[in-house]
Amino acid sequence: MNNFYLPLMEDNIDREDVNTLINFLNQTPIPKLTNGPKVVEFENAWGQWLGTKYNLMVNSGASANELTILALNELYEDGEVILPPLTWISDVSSVIFSEFTPVFCDINLKNLSFDLEKLKKLITPKTRAIFLTHVLGINGLTDELLNICKENNIHLIEDVCESHGTTFKGKKVGSYGFVSNFSFYFAHHMSTIEGGIICTNDERFYQICRALRSHGMIREMTNESMRNEIINNNPDLNKDFIFLRPSHNFRSAIMHLQ
């Protein structure tokens, strides 16, 4: 029997991309190289393409996963997150890092998404989110899955790191869940060499993510009333150095967006 080989990925960075980056770096004065206007421009363009109101660029898809679950921990102190065994390790590790309990649900072989009969049996009062992975460009959504989330008041998180542009009922996946994550790793459908983005229609969740992207600093929040509420609750602290909770630097280098 002949061996069949289908490459999973190839480097999609070409000479034109490299030259564009060189020209950007050769500007005078030297452009801002981290979290500048190009990042905001990209976030807005991505939101228009996907159909989500709030979009936050980070330095990798893995960081998008970790930051999403860290922000979820601001909404719920503990609980369980259901996820498939067929996923990338960062989905699982992000749940563990934020001290949620990962609960694994087997997949079906039709779309490599959850076996919904098994999923229903795993839902408990402690279930905080269902973390879906769209595998290799295959849509993992069904009406039944969306109804399960709605009926049980459970957040749906979509991992779309390897399924950019996949659709379900005429809408792009990543626009259905409470929040979705994309990766722009060098071998994915669209690349910034390294990078990722968090997408949601929930402003409070977005503002939490904004703070946590930069060590947890609330001065990164753009919603003044949310920021002032935290400042007023901490009158003894310098308002420029109030941190929502322990976090990391998830910011993206602007060079990746050229």
What annotation goes with each model-predicted range?
Residues S163-K169, Y176-Q258:
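Active-site region of PLP-dependent enzymes
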Residues M1-K32, L244:
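N-terminal "arm"/small-domain region of PLP-dependent enzymes with the aminotransferase-like
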Residues L50, Y76, P125, G174-S175, ...:
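Structured loop/turn residues at beta-strand edges in well-structured enzyme cores
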